[in-house]
Curated annotation (Swiss-Prot):
Catalytic activity, as annotated: a plastoquinone + NADH + (n+1) H(+)(in) = a plastoquinol + NAD(+) + n H(+)(out); a plastoquinone + NADPH + (n+1) H(+)(in) = a plastoquinol + NADP(+) + n H(+)(out)
Protein name per Swiss-Prot or TrEMBL: NAD(P)H-quinone oxidoreductase subunit 5, chloroplastic
Gene3D superfamilies named among the record's database cross-references: 1.20.5.2700
BP GO terms, sorted: ATP synthesis coupled electron transport; electron transport coupled proton transport
Subcellular location: Plastid, Chloroplast thylakoid membrane
InterPro entries reported in the protein's UniProt record: NADH_UbQ_OxRdtase_chlpt_su5_C, NADHpl_OxRdtase_5_subgr, ND/Mrp_TM, NU5C-like, Proton_antipo_N
Keyword DNA damage appears in the UniProt entry: no
Biological source species: Acorus calamus var. americanus
Entry similarity comment: Belongs to the complex I subunit 5 family.
Enzyme class, spelled out: translocase
Length: 739
């Protein structure tokens, strides 16, 4: 066992040779490297698989042995200061290693096919391998200096991958936005690290925790300054894990390739912030009010992310806001003292969200031959619908991932999410109400995504996609739908006659004539004399295999944390895994879970989720939509003041969600303009005042010199006369003043 731990430092460096080899190959032998490009994908998967096997061995030993191992190399700069570099293996590290390697392998296998036709194939795998190296280095770091170094490398890799298609202006802007937003958090993290070093004199976690605890207990440190340093550390986690108010980069990060979205949202960049909070939780618990601050940010993010996901058209952006909301749950958990629940939900959410993003990539991949390769079309759920007929395997995997995220038993997220929901009642009833209500919103927006994508008919045939202005058959109008006919943009929920009434909550079904059916049946394009049907198609096996593997994780990974000890069989593997970390936090590890209480709370949470699913089916399900066109039902619809008021409320919710809560507008219009105005003021002061004084001295000197120059005519006699005259004047003045 000791032998295994001694070589654990190799794990972060295993994927790195791929990055170096691709870079050197493209520089030295570019033709051969490009011709053999598929072999680099194989080596990427192989090396990360070796890291996964190594990580699994460490995890098994952690579960069985439950102890913490740390090894450090000391680099002495002088007699008073030295830096230590090393690696730390504990339950938190082993959990993150398993997450990063397993999800990373699935994404790499998936990417081999997804990126096969992209000119940046090699560059993509070089970035991905370096991304995995950076994240593995981050989670094995033994001190804050190493954390910060790998933290910056993770940010750099995310910048490169989000802007992978940098020739696209939206992608270039998105990576810049992610970079700048994370700069704010990284600056806070750096200040917090320096502040804590100034207080404790150490970067090592164990020393830092013990010293700071003793200083606070003995009142030997200013508590406000310690709280400020801890808050600055948390700001770094807020930015990296897309928590309010530094969440604005996450939806725009969808401009990168879909495999990158899966990796960022499941096991790498957004998990880095959660990891930092979990690693520093012993520090946060001894500083007053920091835990309250963490829980407050978490609950705000939970609700904000869910509301912003309600009206998005882009399938990846909807999943991005879903990630933001779920990360809010994970951030809320340690804030209320539920360390185990936070890591449990981090695990279950990682696999479920990776499955959903890879499923969305399969959907986009199937839509691109029909609508083109523009993300505004291939990712637009309004042009989808009815895909269950064409991509059945993707549909099944996406459905299971959706159920898991909604908290449906016995899928993975049910067990972890319920644990967080139950713990919120012990912390604050207000937080509990928000968290439980958001569980219903989660079910609503996730099934909205599922129904818009897979239910009904393929909407690209009904959206005037051929750029024709007239369409005599089926039309729908839903939240986020751009109807062909002009509508009042200030009244998204129409109050037309019953024959033309549209709802942005539901689909309005109209009768399809024979021409419309023929158009649907034979929607095709002609290449020469050959007609090729333009319908979505299922992805290749290379893309389906990772999704099926992630389905297995989604089905069974939740069982590692079932909190029931039946005497003979202890199903709670996670608690055994986390025993050293729980003891470090001085938490009560002997908490018992009552079966009756758990089932009662589970019934409540599942009922709320079912309510959200039911509402989604009412508003977006094709079966229910067919009843909305009946005159009997329409006759009961009355346009009165209450209906208009409800329409305005719904429109307000829609506008809030679709416009991202106006937070981006606020940052763009207020903060950016304020900073730009301040910069212009400073520029004016520098150019006109500072430079004006300097230039004024030069101008005055110039004119004085020119004046003196004009006096002289170049004759020596004139100079002698002026000299004698000046001396005479000086003598006369001296004579009169001396008396």
């Amino acid at each position: 066992m000791e032998h295994t731990y001694q070589y654990a430092w190799i794990i972060p460096f295993l994927p790195f040779p791929v990055t170096i080899s691709i870079g050197l190959g493209l520089l030295l032998v570019p033709t051969a490297t490009k011709n053999l490009r598929r072999i680099w994908a194989f080596f990427s998967v192989l090396l990360l698989s070796i890291a996964m096997v190594f990580s699994a061995d460490l995890a098994i030993q952690q579960i069985n042995g439950s102890f913490i191992y740390q090894y450090s190399w000391s680099w002495t700069i002088n007699n008073t200061f030295s830096l230590e570099f090393g690696y730390l293996i504990d339950p938190l590290t082993s959990i993150m290693l398993i997450l990063i390697t397993t999800v990373g392998i699935m994404v790499l296998i998936y990417s081999d096919n997804y990126m096969s036709h992209d000119q940046g194939y090699l560059r993509f795998f070089a970035y991905m391998s370096f991304f995995n190296t950076s994240m593995l280095g981050l989670v094995t770091s033994s001190n804050l200096i190493q954390i910060y170094i790998f933290w910056e490398l993770v940010g750099m890799c995310s910048y490169l991958l989000i802007g992978f298609w940098f020739t696209r202006p939206t992608a270039a802007n998105a990576c810049q936005k992610a970079f700048v937003t994370n700069r704010v958090g990284d600056f806070g993290l750096l200040l917090g690290i320096l502040g804590l070093y100034w207080i404790t004199g150490s970067f090592e976690f164990r020393d830092l925790f013990e010293i700071l605890k003793n200083l606070i207990h003995n009142n030997e440190v200013n508590s406000l300054f310690a709280a400020l340093c801890a808050s600055l550390l948390f700001v770094g986690a807020v930015a990296k894990s897309a928590q309010f108010p530094l969440h604005v980069w996450l939806p725009d990060a969808m401009e990168g390739p879909t495999p990158i979205s899966a990796l960022i949202h499941a096991a790498t960049m957004v998990a880095a912030g959660i990891f930092l909070v979990a690693r520093l939780l012993p520090l946060f618990t001894v500083i007053p009010y920091i835990m309250n601050f963490i829980s407050l940010i978490g609950i705000i993010t939970v609700l904000l992310g869910a509301t912003l996901a309600l009206a998005q058209r882009d399938i990846k952006r909807s999943l991005a806001y879903s990630t933001m909301s779920q990360l809010g749950y994970i951030m809320l958990a340690p804030g209320i003292g539920s360390y185990r629940a936070a890591l449990f939900h981090l695990i279950t959410h990682a696999y479920s969200k990776a499955l959903l993003f890879l499923g969305s990539g399969s959907i986009i991949h199937s839509m691109e031959p029909i609508v083109g390769y523009s993300p505004e079309k291939s990712q637009n759920m309004i042009l989808m619908g009815g895909l269950r007929r064409y991509v059945p395997i993707t549909k099944t995997t996406f459905f299971l991932g959706t159920l898991s995220l909604c908290g449906m038993p016995p899928l993975a997220c049910f067990w972890s999410k319920d644990e967080i929901l139950n713990d919120t009642w012990l912390y604050s009833p207000i937080f509990a109400i928000i968290a439980w209500s958001t569980a219903g919103l989660t079910a609503f927006y996730m099934f909205r995504v599922y129904l818009l994508t897979f239910d009904g008919h393929l909407q690209v045939h009904f959206q005037n996609f051929s750029s024709t202005k007239n369409s005599s058959f089926y039309s729908i109008s839903i939240w986020g739908k751009e109807v062909p006919k002009p509508l009042n943009v200030n009244l998204f929920l129409s109050t037309m006659n019953t024959n033309e009434k549209m709802s942005f909550f539901s689909k309005n079904t109209y009768q399809i004539d024979r021409n419309g059916k023929n158009r649907i049946r034979y929607f095709s394009t002609q290449f020469g004399n050959k007609y090729t049907s333009m319908y979505p198609h299922e992805s290749d096996n290379t893309m389906l295999f990772p999704m099926l593997v992630l389905v297995l994780f989604t089905l069974f990974i939740g069982f590692i944390g079932i909190p029931f000890d039946q005497g003979v069989i202890d199903l709670d593997i996670l608690s055994k895994w986390l025993t050293p970390s729980i003891n470090l936090l001085h938490s009560n590890s002997g908490d018992s879970f009552d079966w009756y209480e758990f089932v009662t709370n589970a019934i409540y949470s599942v009922t709320i989720s079912f309510l959200g699913i039911f509402l989604a089916y009412i508003f977006y399900g094709s079966v229910y939509s067919s009843f909305q066109n009946l005159d009997l039902i329409n006759s009961f619809v009355r346009i009165d003041s209450k209906r208009i008021l409800s329409d305005r409320i719904i429109n307000g919710i829609y506008n809030w969600s679709y416009n991202r809560g106006y937070i981006d507008v606020f940052y763009g219009k207020v903060l950016s303009n304020t900073i730009r105005g301040l910069a212009e003021l400073i520029h004016f002061f520098d150019r006109r005042v500072i430079d004006g004084i300097t230039n004024g001295v030069g101008v005055v000197s110039f004119f004085v010199g020119e004046g003196i120059k004009s006096v002289g005519g170049g004759r020596i006699s004139s100079y002698i006369f002026l000299y004698a005259f000046s001396v005479s004047i000086c003598l006369i003045i001296y004579y009169f003043f001396s008396f």
